Curated annotation (Swiss-Prot):
The family this protein is said to belong to: Belongs to the IncA family.
Keywords for the protein's UniProt record, in alphabetical order: Coiled coil, Host membrane, Membrane, Secreted, Transmembrane, Transmembrane helix
Keyword Cytoplasm assigned: no
Protein name (record): Inclusion membrane protein A
GO cellular component term, pick one: host cell membrane
């Protein structure tokens, strides 16, 4: 039988540690650069807007100032683009670290599930061994029933060979009872074959298999009782046959002696005449 399993609660997943790959925190200089970049974006937008509006007038009035403003605009735009590129990589790195932490938690949960699955597989192997042992016991019991059935077949052959003598010696009621017992025994033995297939189909359900085994034990006990009754009846019939044969032989010997005695008495009388 299977031993009761202890359900172990899985430990809480470890908190993701970033000792080796710690996310760099933005420093004061980075914050200042970020504020400066935002301010420069506002300034560049304003300058660009003014440059677009006063491009024609400015180029005609003061082309040198327009060129300086355009160079400033291009330089600020390039610096902001470079800063945004670095900041985007930093955000991607932080998102990647968060995904790595979630993957570590998932990996831990998968390891816990793997341990639970291994425990369940061991329990299933133990249950399979128990079921195989029960199946072997059932098959040995069925083999015993088949051997008993073969013995009853040979006994029936002997009864068929001596049918005429049994009809003369015994009443029809005893023979009818014997035939009914043998027929019921055959029906119960035939019932065992589909029951064996049912046991194979119910091998995955231990409770129903236990109930079927209990039913088989009940049938086995009833079969043993009937076998005992049949063996007792066979012994009774054998003793009666032997007694009847002895009485018949005694009767035959008496008849022979009776028949031989007149002949002996008749032979001296013939000699005297």
């Amino acid at each position: 039988m299977t031993t009761p399993t202890l359900i172990v609660t899985p430990p809480s997943p470890p908190a993701p540690s970033y000792s080796a790959n710690r996310v760099p925190q933005p420093s004061l200089m980075d914050k200042i650069k970020k504020i400066a970049a935002i301010a420069s974006l506002i300034l560049i937008g304003t300058i660009g807007f003014l440059a677009l509006l006063g491009h024609l007038v400015g180029f005609l009035i003061a082309p040198q100032i327009t060129i300086v403003l355009l160079a400033l605009f291009i330089t600020s735009l390039a610096g902001n683009a470079l800063y945004l590129q670095k900041t985007a990589n930093l955000h991607l790195y932080q998102d990647l670290q968060r995904e790595v932490g979630s993957l570590k938690e998932i990996n831990f949960m998968l390891s816990v599930l793997q341990k639970e699955f291994l425990h369940l597989s061991k329990e299933f192997a133990t249950t399979s061994k128990d079921l195989s042992a029960v199946s072997q016991d059932f098959y040995s019991c069925l083999q015993g029933f088949r051997d008993n059935y073969k013995g009853f077949e040979s006994l029936l052959d002997e009864y068929k060979n001596s049918t005429e003598e049994m009809r003369k010696l015994f009443s029809q009621e005893i023979i009818a009872d014997l035939k009914g017992s043998v027929a019921s025994l055959r029906e119960e033995i035939r019932f065992l074959t589909p029951l064996a297939e049912e046991v194979r189909r119910l091998a995955h359900n231990q409770e129903s298999l236990t109930a079927a085994i209990e039913e088989l034990k009940t049938i086995r006990d009833s079969l043993r009782d009937e076998i005992g009754q049949l063996s007792q009846l066979s012994k009774t019939l054998t003793s009666q046959i032997a007694l009847q044969r002895k009485e018949s032989s005694d009767l035959c010997s008496q008849i022979r002696e009776t028949l031989s005695s007149p002949r002996k008495s008749a032979s001296p009388s013939t000699k005297s005449s």
